């Protein structure tokens, strides 16, 4: 953290009153409690969250738990940081203040008001936009907003007049954007999933002209799918007409943002966890889109989800056929082994096992791509036991595809610890 322990390491003496009495670190967000003592907000928040009801320094009982920002001290600390910049001290940023409960209640009241002569759609949307700004600032703000019945209000606004609401409505856009920042409960997710009209509306939002609405719609679908525990309700969502096409469009769009890609792969993975509708993903073109994206620009977590989705779809014969037709599938799966993470290796090995079991051509491609060497390294690595089992099964499948001068005939293989076939 800027201005935390680094100045001490440089031999610079931090003024006593700039240190938090709890952590002894330079304060970045000083606040004063009812006893008049000042602490760093993070430290005193943790102290109170642990159930303590006294001042850490004076041991006097707190008359209330209000934290008052000490702007004067914070500015003095910032000036000190600037004065010591040449010594490697970075200026602490001006912290954003936590949401005020009274303001949150007022904004939610304005957002939920009935549109009429005194309250316009624009003013309601503006109230939700301000709440969204607060929610983006911190998890504490999100908890505060959710604690004032915000999710129920937002769901009611979002799904009001489903048949007549304009999909590009500012009110729909803002309420959707805020809702996906809050954590819906299992009951709330199942209430949405159990209503076919609401599921249909979420699916229609995937085809809106606004990319932000489409991305947030996919985020809401993923949230509801993950939150609802009933498989029957998950099936209602994954079976919604064109839902796979809408989510996959986020992945194949060449101008997709990093957030769109991340939410898109999370949503398609959640949809493909529903076994009964995986064939819809295949018919919607998921195999080609997934391989193209995996070969291009996923980060590690997204790569893991993408590979997990590939393995799920390879459990269907039509999935194996579709992936097998893509020229990059087998080489990409082989390349992934031991390159990304243990999970990625396990999923890639699982997909290759399904592909090589289904088609001799895939076995030949895998052997030509150097899979044998990768598998021999894998079974002797610290990877997961599941990955090693898949590797050994693949080795058995591939032995007939190994050329005469391959690893199988080398001294290295004879000395390896691979279990005999």
Curated annotation (Swiss-Prot):
GO terms for biological process: defense response to other organism; protein ubiquitination. InterPro entries: ARM-like, ARM-type_fold, PUB22/23/24-like, RING-Ubox_PUB, Ubox_domain, Znf_RING/FYVE/PHD. The keyword DNA damage does not apply. This is U-box domain-containing protein 26. The gene is PUB26. Residues 13-87 form the U-box domain. Gene3D superfamilies: Leucine-rich Repeat Variant, Zinc/RING finger domain, C3HC4 (zinc finger). Pathway: Protein modification; protein ubiquitination. One of its GO terms (molecular function) is ubiquitin protein ligase activity. Functions as an E3 ubiquitin ligase. Keywords: Transferase, Ubl conjugation pathway. It comes from Arabidopsis thaliana (Mouse-ear cress). It is an enzyme of class 2 (transferase). It comes from the Eukaryota. It catalyses: S-ubiquitinyl-[E2 ubiquitin-conjugating enzyme]-L-cysteine + [acceptor protein]-L-lysine = [E2 ubiquitin-conjugating enzyme]-L-cysteine + N(6)-ubiquitinyl-[acceptor protein]-L-lysine. PROSITE patterns: U_BOX (PS51698). SMART domains: Ubox. Its EC number is 2.3.2.27. The keyword Transferase applies. SUPFAM superfamilies: ARM repeat, RING/U-box.
């Amino acid at each position: 953290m800027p201005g935390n322990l680094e100045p001490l390491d440089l031999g610079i003496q931090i003024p006593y009153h700039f240190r938090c009495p709890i952590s002894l670190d330079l304060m970045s967000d000083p606040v004063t409690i009812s006893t008049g003592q000042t602490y760093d907000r993070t430290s005193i928040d943790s102290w109170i969250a642990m159930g303590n009801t006294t001042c850490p320094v004076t041991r006097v009982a707190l008359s209330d738990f209000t934290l008052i920002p000490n702007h004067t001290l914070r500015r003095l600390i910032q000036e000190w940081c600037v004065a010591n910049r040449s010594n490697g001290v970075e200026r602490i940023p001006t912290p954003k203040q936590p949401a005020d409960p009274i303001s949150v209640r007022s904004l939610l009241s304005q957002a939920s008001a009935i549109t009429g002569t005194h309250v316009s759609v624009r003013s309601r949307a503006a109230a939700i936009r301000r709440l969204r700004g607060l929610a983006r600032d911190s998890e504490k703000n999100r908890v505060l907003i959710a604690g004032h019945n915000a999710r129920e209000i937002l769901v009611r606004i979002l799904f009001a007049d489903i048949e007549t609401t304009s999909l590009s409505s500012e009110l729909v856009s803002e309420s959707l954007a805020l809702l996906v920042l809050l954590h819906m409960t299992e009951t709330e997710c199942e209430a949405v999933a159990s209503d076919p009209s609401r599921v249909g509306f979420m699916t229609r939002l995937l085809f809106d002209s606004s990319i932000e609405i489409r991305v947030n719609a996919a985020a809401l679908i993923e949230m509801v799918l993950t939150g609802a525990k009933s498989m029957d309700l998950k099936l209602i969502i994954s079976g919604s007409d064109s839902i796979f096409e809408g989510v996959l469009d986020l992945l194949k769009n060449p101008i997709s943002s990093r957030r769109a890609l991340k939410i898109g792969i999370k949503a398609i993975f959640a949809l493909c966890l529903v076994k009964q509708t995986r064939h819809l993903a295949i018919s919607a073109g998921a195999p080609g889109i997934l391989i193209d994206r995996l070969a291009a620009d996923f980060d590690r977590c997204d790569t893991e989800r993408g590979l997990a989705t590939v393995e799920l779809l390879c459990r269907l014969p039509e999935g194996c056929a579709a992936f097998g037709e893509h020229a990059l599938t087998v080489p990409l799966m082989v390349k992934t082994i031991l390159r990304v993470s243990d999970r990625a290796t396990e999923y890639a090995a699982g997909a290759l096992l399904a592909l090589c079991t289904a088609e001799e051509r895939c076995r030949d491609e895998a052997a030509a791509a150097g899979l044998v060497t990768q598998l021999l390294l894998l079974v002797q690595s610290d990877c997961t036991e599941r990955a090693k089992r898949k590797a050994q099964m693949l080795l058995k499948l591939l032995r007939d595809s190994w050329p005469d001068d391959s690893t199988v005939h080398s001294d290295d293989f004879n000395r390896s610890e691979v279990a005999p076939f």
